[in-house]
Amino acid sequence: MAIVSKSKEKNKIIRPADFRTTLFNMPKIDLHRHLEGSLRLSTLAEIARQHGVDLPSLSLEELRPYVQVVDDPPDFLVFLAKFKLLRRFYSSREAVERIAYEAVADAAADNVRYLELRFSPVA
C-alpha cells in the first residue's frame, strides 16, 4: 500500500517504509504534554539514587511498567496510577528544572516546534 501526498510534488507516492520518516520530519505542535509523563527512565533512576527515592527496581526495563502504560488494559485508573510514583521525583527545584529541560529537548528532537507543557504538582 502506498500513500498519496497532496504536497507541492503533486500526487507524490510515499512508500510505507518512508512514511514513518516523513511523519517524523514534519513540524509538529503539542498542545497538551504533561511534565509528569515526560520523565526519562534514566533520569528517574538517577534522581531516585540522588534523593533516596525507593523504587521497585533500578533496572530501566523492570521499572518501565510502573511508570508507563505498557501491557496494561486501556483503563483510565491504571493510567492515573502511574502518576503516583512519578510525582515523587519532583522533589527539588533542580530535579524539576532538569526534567523540564529534558522534556523540551525531547520534544525538539521529535520536531515539535510549539509545545504547551503543563505540570500539576498537587493533583
Feature map (PLM): residue ranges:
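Metal-cofactor-binding active-site regions of metalloenzymes
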Residues: 2-123
